[in-house]
Amino acid sequence: MEPEFLYDLLQLPKGVEPPAEEELSKGGKKKYLPPTSRKDPKFEELQKVLMEWINATLLPEHIVVRSLEEDMFDGLILHHLFQRLAALKLEAEDIALTATSQKHKLTVVLEAVNRSLQLEEWQAKWSVESIFNKDLLSTLHLLVALAKRFQPDLSLPTNVQVEVITIESTKSGLKSEKLVEQLTEYSTDKDEPPKDVFDELFKLAPEKVNAVKEAIVNFVNQKLDRLGLSVQNLDTQFADGVILLLLIGQLEGFFLHLKEFYLTPNSPAEMLHNVTLALELLKDEGLLSCPVSPEDIVNKDAKSTLRVLYGLFCKHTQKAHRDRTPHGAPN
């Protein structure tokens, strides 16, 4: 290996292992995201905004994404997401267990996406292979393009760019190069924080908001059934904190002594005590993605109530999905 190639490889950041030469065909290239790029605040924010958008879109289908890198590769979530965004039905099997069937499903979905975006295959910054191989950059390029096409008012962080390491197999060995990859458009305006996903939800048509509420009410009633309780009105029935505390106890395995809360609160102060206790429990469990005022819950603010229940919904719907998913699928 010539000195310049050795020097290039020595520039790889700690934590990025150079591939063996046999992993790349001659002339082949592969991108790596160094740890410093992964930890870039704007890069992390972009992933967060996209995940919240996907989860809000797929909430009526009880589908929850926890990781864009790990959850998108097999085409299942992309299939459901694109069908809902484009309001069409794709001829692809719902469940694909083998690598071959997953790639076929992904091919069908990406061909439909590219047609919708009016892109030739060579123009797209993603491919079946890159998505299937869990290439985070390709996945982000794809999701950003879908968001711009189907929800242009989604407030993505602007000018997100990350440093990537490109490894190329040449006649003389492996050569590395540092490049900057642009993920979202540059804006000359002062960057604004992304809009809250629930603020965006409540700007949609009432039937879409109601569909989300209905999905969460169904989830809550499934969990409260063993207690002989049910919820009909999400906006009002959580205001005193009692059902919220009982729901948290059921889902998170907490035993709450009756001395710790008011089972039949008779005043706003007692209701506020219950709701404050519930929010503290959720915060301790990492289930509050952003601050919620207990007064808003007591005052029957639908958006705040929905935000609180959404954290529980995501965690336990995802857990149920993992429990049902077969492991060790054959290739």
Swiss-Prot record:
Residues 44-151, 210-317 form the Calponin-homology (CH) domain. It is found in: Cell junction, Focal adhesion; Cell membrane; Cytoplasm, Cytoskeleton. Residues 17-39 are annotated as: Disordered. Keywords: Acetylation, Actin-binding, Cell adhesion, Cell junction, Cell membrane, Cytoplasm, Cytoskeleton, Membrane, Repeat. GO terms for biological process: actin cytoskeleton organization; cell projection assembly; cell-matrix adhesion; establishment or maintenance of cell polarity regulating cell shape; substrate adhesion-dependent cell spreading. The modification N-acetylmethionine is found at residue 1. The keyword Cell membrane applies. InterPro entries: CH_dom, CH_dom_sf, Parvin. Expressed predominantly in lymphoid organs, including spleen, thymus, lymph node, bone marrow and peripheral blood leukocytes and moderately in the digestive tract, including stomach, duodenum, jejunum, ileum, ileocecum and appendix, as well as in lung and liver. Also expressed in tumors, but at a lower level than in the corresponding normal tissues. It is a peripheral membrane protein. GO terms for molecular function: actin binding. GO terms for cellular component: actin cytoskeleton; cytoplasm; cytoskeleton; focal adhesion; plasma membrane. Its main location: other. Belongs to the parvin family. Interacts with ILK; the interaction promotes the establishment of cell polarity required for leukocyte migration. Interacts with ARHGEF6; the guanine nucleotide exchange factor activity of ARHGEF6 is essential for the PARVG-induced enhancement of cell spreading. Plays a role with ILK in promoting the cell adhesion and spreading of leukocytes. This is Gamma-parvin.
